[in-house]
């Protein structure tokens, strides 16, 4: 059982608890901590609450939704100092420079959380074994879509995006007509916009459309998972 801890300094990360509690069988949510963003322009060090530091010692997976780069850096530093076995996943890095800095703590920095898979993690899955349990349930979506008489009769979610958008999509897909497979997959993926999907909002310095990429990855999951019975 992988124990998951979330830290945020803004509006993101609060859906994680519901997703893990409703879907996780091999993962356990142990808390979310909201910390303040530093007021100073130049930050030499940040002190975190003792309660948070104790939770970091306990956790197997640390999910960071901290938008202030100093918060992210010092949390990665403290996590690696306090817990050599913890896997660090940074959801809200803002550029390649920051990503490179965080790599020295073995931080995993996916383009979007729904693009997190075994290829992204690479050899770190052997170094931090609890990542395997995490990725069995959360990351790049995997589904089985059962179709009978050109209608979806059931959708089985094998792996959901950590925000829960895959689970949301799967619920709404039941009963949909399947005539043109490509069009059906596209319409299914578009359902995550109602969730709404936050891809692209949490990395404000990037100009490319990550929300579209999140839609595409769900579309591919549907195409790969269709089973006619």
UniProtKB/Swiss-Prot annotation:
A Pfam family the protein falls into: DUF166
Similarity section: To M.jannaschii MJ0838.
Identification of the protein by name: Uncharacterized protein MJ0575
């Amino acid at each position: 059982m992988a124990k998951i801890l979330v830290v945020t300094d803004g509006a993101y990360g609060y859906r994680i608890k519901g997703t893990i509690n409703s879907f996780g069988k091999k993962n356990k949510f142990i808390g979310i901590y909201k910390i303040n963003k530093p007021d100073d322009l130049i930050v030499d060090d940040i002190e975190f609450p003792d309660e948070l530091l104790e939770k970091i010692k306990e956790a197997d997976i640390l999910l960071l939704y901290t938008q202030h780069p100093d918060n992210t850096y010092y949390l990665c530093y403290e996590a690696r100092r306090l817990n050599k076995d913890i896997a660090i996943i940074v959801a809200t890095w803002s550029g390649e420079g920051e990503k490179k800095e965080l790599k020295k703590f073995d931080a995993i920095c996916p383009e979007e959380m729904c693009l997190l898979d075994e290829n992204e993690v690479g050899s770190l899955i052997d170094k931090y074994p609890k990542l395997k349990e995490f990725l069995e349930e959360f990351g790049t979506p995997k589904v089985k879509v059962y179709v009978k008489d050109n209608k979806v009769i059931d959708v089985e979610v094998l792996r959901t995006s950590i925000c829960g958008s895959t689970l949301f999509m799967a619920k709404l897909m039941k009963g949909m007509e399947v005539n043109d497979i490509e069009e059906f997959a596209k319409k299914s993926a578009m359902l995550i916009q109602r969730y709404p999907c936050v891809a692209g909002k949490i990395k404000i310095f990037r100009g490319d459309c990550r929300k579209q990429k999140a839609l595409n990855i769900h579309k591919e999951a549907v195409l790969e998972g269709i089973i006619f019975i």
